[in-house]
Structure formats: C-alpha cells, structure tokens
Amino acid sequence: MQQATAPKISFVSLGCPKALVDSERIITRLRAEGYELARKHDGADLVIVNTCGFLDSAKQESLAAIGEAMATNGKVIVTGCMGAEPEQIEAAYPGVLSITGPQQYESVLEAVHRARPALHNPHLDLVPPQGVRLTPRHYAYLKISEGCNNRCSFCIIPKLRGDLVSRPAGDVLREAEKLVAAGVKELLVISQDTSAYGVDVKYAESPWKDRAVRAKFLDLASELGELGAWVRLHYVYPYPHVDEVIGLMADGKVLPYLDIPFQHASPDVLKLMKRPAAQDKTLDRIKRWREQCPDLALRSTFIVGFPGETERDFEFLLEWLDEAEIDRLGAFKYEPVAGAPSNALPDQIADEVKQERWNRLMARQQAISARRLKRKVGTRQQVIIDEIGPTVAKGRSKADAPDIDGAVYLSSRRPLRVGEIVTAKIDRADAYDLHGTVAGF
C-alpha cells in the first residue's frame, strides 16, 4: 500500500521582525505535527499569509500577497496584524478559509487542521530544540514581549497587538540559550518597546538556572550578555533607565548599539505625535552615552511631513541630526493610517513637501554617515560573515544590524564561513558601507 504523503504548507511572512517571529512559531508547530513546507504556492495543500497592517501601503502589499495565493492555490489562511480588522480582506477575497489577528497561533493551527488534517499525532522531536527559524542560522530574533502601552498618535499597533505583555525572563533566557546552543552567534532583541520590558508585571522574578531573574530591561540584557553571543538591542525608547545599559556595552557584555525610534526632534512635533520620553535633553544624554561607551552606534527612524510640521520644525530636526550624529537612519514620509488619531490633526502636509523634506533629510544623513564611517578607516573591527561571494565576503560590524544597516565587504586569503566572526582591518569607507581585509593575512 502506498504511504500517504505529508501535507504541504506554503508560507508568506510580511512585515516587521516581530511578525517574523510569529511566523517562526507557527511553522515550528506545523513541523512538529508533521506538516512540510512548500517552496511554491502551486502544489501546496494550503497557503498561510502572515500580513502587515501598520501602513496603508503595507495593507496593499498584504492584499496583493493574498490575491497571488488565491490565484495560484485557492486555499488560503490569513493571519497577522491586518487580520485584526478582517473586513477589507473579506471584501476583496471572500473565499479565504480563515482570518485571524496577530499572535493567534492556536486559531491558525485549528484552521489548518480543519482544512488539511495532519497524518499523525505531533511528536516534538520532529523539530530541532530551537524550533524552525526563517532567518539565517547564525542570527535570530528574540521577542521579549508583545503589544505596547504607548499611544502615539500615528500608530495603531496597540489596537492590533494589544497592551504590553512581557514574557517571563526565565522563558526568554531559556529560548536564547537553545538558540546559542544551536549555533546562533547573534541575538536581536525585539519587541514594540524593549525598554518597557517588565513594566506590566512589575518586574516579576522567574527562575533561571540556580537563581531568580527580574523581568527588567537591565537584568535581562545582563543575563543575555553571559550567553556568549552578540546581543543587539532594538526598539528602545529613550527612557531615563536606558542609561543603565550603557555600562554593559562599555564592558563588552552586549553590543554597543542602540536602535531608538526618536521619530523627530522638534518638541512641538513630538507633542503632536504623543511620543513617550519626548524630552529636550536627549542630545545631552547621547553625549554622555558616547563618553561612557565611545564605540556606541545609534540607529533611529524619523517621520517627515507629519501634520503640523513647519519648515522651522524640520530645520530643527536637521540641526539636531548634525549634533547627534546618528550612525544609521531610516526615514519615512508620513502616511495616514486608518484608525490613527493623527489623521484628524490639522495642517496636513502636501506630498511634494514631504518628498522634498525627505530628500533633504537623507542627503544630510548621507553626509553624517560618510563622516562617521571615515573615522573607522585604519581601525580593526569584528565582523560577522553573512554571505560568501566569488571575490569578497559580505558581513556586518557590531554597528550594523541585518537588513536595515550597512555592510562590511571583506577580502581574505583564507576561506571564510557564514556565521564566522573575524577581525578585519578597515581599508576604506563610502557613505554607508566599509571595505577591508581579514586581519592576519
């Protein structure tokens, strides 16, 4: 008798690293139950689309992905942030099998079971102990909480993902330990508000090895720094207690890197945005951080053309950037999001003004980036290898997160391996990237 084949699932993951972690969790459960992953929609038994609903452009991308899955397969399960408001999906594609919001893993699995039951009962040893990941083997995203307590006027994340829910520190550390044991060299700590970690549970302790660890930003970062991997901190709001973690960076416990979404510098615009920690002494703090940890790299995102942003506000931002010298910057032109309070603000900015300001901001940042990278020429930097090319290898320094920051291009007389961390001599720099040779050869 011919043995039945395992059902195959095609998976599309859209949006931010938090959504990617959600996708990894769903896939890990499916693999544990005997489902296989298909590379293409046609030939798969089902397609799961994990959507993004943060911006209208992201919603359009999600709808396009659903449409492609419906056209090439026809059996589609939708989950993720856009699924929290299913009306638009239902109107465009009434034939989808199921629609669920973010973090609703059990509902997704139930929908899969209804549409295509597994062949046998789950056995957890069918998957590796670290689970199934969608990133390269040498780095992994480590999500420490869900949701957000902030109510920024341009954001609907709390509406989609709820208020802050922190994971117990012991659970986070056990996951991190498994990842490192499986060969992960870099842990990228993510959440909606990493520096607020533990506020919702009043920094409750949980067991970890032979001791109790508080669910607190500093405590967790300190423990992660003992696992022997690079630890990179993302989505950190500039609350006063962030100052405490700079010492860990100066001591080499965690990477000297902070991803802080400042969004703007003008006090008036920050007030309209309803940003937390919107204080006017941020420049002083950045100066103190760099005095304590000279190698500190700062990444941030900014919004230009926010309703009410005047030319004076924008010039303030440019002058602030000149003084702050942010190492890595992402900029977005303000885009109305359905359900966001900022839609009702007066003095909306014309699209051509948004574009003009975005161009000026990026030109200013390009000069800042080139200036800061030039200072690294002649120095030695640790570099983690991401790709091996025919003539050079592509990697990242401690100042570069994957996908969003710059790269280091290296020549080497010996073969290099993906995931290897090497010491490189920096020979030259351009606006966003470094070029060098592996030291010692």
From Swiss-Prot:
Domain Radical SAM core: residue ranges: 134-371
Every MTTase N-terminal domain range: 7-117
SMART domains hit by this protein: Elp3 (SM00729)
Gene3D superfamilies in alphabetical order: Methylthiotransferase, N-terminal domain (3.40.50.12160), Nucleic acid-binding proteins (2.40.50.140), tm_1862 like domain (3.80.30.20)
Top-level enzyme category: transferase
Biological processes, Gene Ontology terms: tRNA modification
Localization of this protein: Cytoplasm
Keyword Signal: no
Pfam families: Radical_SAM, TRAM_2, UPF0004
InterPro entries: Elp3/MiaA/NifB-like_rSAM, Methylthiotransferase, Methylthiotransferase_CS, Methylthiotransferase_N, Methylthiotransferase_N_sf, NA-bd_OB-fold, Ribosomal_uS12_MeSTrfase_RimO, rSAM
Binding site for [4Fe-4S] cluster 2: C148, C152, C155
One annotated GO molecular function: protein methylthiotransferase activity
Cellular component aspect of the GO annotation: cytosol
HAMAP family in UniProt: MTTase_RimO
Function: Catalyzes the methylthiolation of an aspartic acid residue of ribosomal protein uS12.
Similarity field: Belongs to the methylthiotransferase family. RimO subfamily.
Protein name (record): Ribosomal protein uS12 methylthiotransferase RimO
Native source organism of the sequence: Rhodopseudomonas palustris (strain ATCC BAA-98 / CGA009)
